[in-house]
Each structure stands twice: as structure tokens, then as C-alpha cells.
């Protein structure tokens, strides 16, 4: 299975990793919490530096969502440490989350994070993993484009809301063009349920298959 990209809905592979915060076991060390694993091509590169600063600036928001951050690249621990020190010294931002030092590329190959035509650097990817260790979202970005932290936070909030309320989340939520901050109720599974839903005061509906509500 080496090199196969894990799929959404599968359990995150059990991995023992070296990080700037010591050894960790994934996903075990994050049981009971969500975590966002994000890989970056290399330390001491401009786009990756802007991403690390952006993640750190929003770290408290992730923690309020019971969500931890962990970075990853094919670099050694001392490279991560020197880069983090540079960010603190030159940019005034202290990186508080751990960064995986995958110097041999074993973790990256296991997660399918090395593109054959892009050399040996890790691709720019995001895994969102839930408290049970299940992969809930995977996002890839091109090497030349940095990630949007607002969207990653939105995805975590959306997944948590979907799990808690048993609903689906519309585009651009919570500022959807049709239903604003409402959420979508799963379609009715019978004619009777569809009729009841259209008559219910608990929902608003465009039609029996498109009903929504506030949460």
C-alpha cells in the first residue's frame, strides 16, 4: 500500500513520526481531537513561510474547534528548528504546532504525498482527520499557490456541524447565496415524509428535495 493515497472515509494510517515536539504516533496521539495535517514542499521557501505564519495566526481558532495542527515535509528536524527560529526572529511569529521531520520520505510515501514528476519534495496537501482517526477531507494545492486558512477552518466547522446536526452544508457556508447560514436537511426517503416536510414549520423548502433550516 506504500504510495497509495488514503481515501476520505478511511482510517488515517498508523504512523510513528519524528517532530519538532518529539516522537508522536498518528492518529493515536490525537484521539478525541480533530487534527489537520498539512504537508509543505520545503523549509526556507517563501510560500511555505507565509503558510506557516498564517496557520499560527489562526491556531487559537483551530484549538477552539478541538483541532490540532501538524506540519510535514521531507526535511530534517534541525532544518525545521532553524526555520522556525528564523520565522520567530525575522517575522516575530512563534510557531507552536509540531512539524514532522520526514527526512527519509517514508511518511510522505505512505500518504501518497510525493508527485513522481515533481522530484522528492512533498506536495502541498491537507488532511482533515476526526476524533476517531477517520480521514474526512483531503485537499491538494499546486506548488505555486499557498493555502487559504479561512477555507480550512470553514471545512472543519462544516464537518463538525454536519456530524452534530445530521445535515449537509451548502456552498460558501455560512454565507450561502441562497440560504445564508442555514444548513441543508437530508432529502426525504418516502412520499409521506416529503409531504410532511413541505407542511412542517421546522423547515423552509424550495421543493421537497431541497429543504433547509437554521442551526
UniProtKB/Swiss-Prot annotation:
Reaction equation(s) it catalyzes: a hydroperoxide + [thioredoxin]-dithiol = an alcohol + [thioredoxin]-disulfide + H2O
Cited SUPFAM superfamilies: Thioredoxin-like
Chief location bin: cytoplasm
Record InterPro entries: AhpC/TSA, Peroxiredoxin, Peroxiredoxin_AhpC-typ, Peroxiredoxin_C, Peroxiredoxin_TDXH, PRX_1cys, Thioredoxin-like_sf, Thioredoxin_domain
Active site: 48 (cysteine sulfenic acid (-soh) intermediate)
Domain called Thioredoxin: residue spans: 6-161
Disulphide-bonded residues: 205-211
Pfam families with a match to the protein in the record: 1-cysPrx_C, AhpC-TSA
GO cellular component, one term: cytosol
Binding residues annotated for substrate, in chain numbering: 124
The EC number(s) this enzyme carries: 1.11.1.24
Assembly and binders: Homodecamer. Pentamer of dimers that assemble into a ring structure.
NCBIfam families (UniProt xref): PRK13189.1
Family: Belongs to the peroxiredoxin family. Prx6 subfamily.
Described function: Thiol-specific peroxidase that catalyzes the reduction of hydrogen peroxide and organic hydroperoxides to water and alcohols, respectively. Plays a role in cell protection against oxidative stress by detoxifying peroxides.
Name the record gives this protein: Peroxiredoxin
Species whose genome carries this gene: Thermotoga petrophila (strain ATCC BAA-488 / DSM 13995 / JCM 10881 / RKU-1)
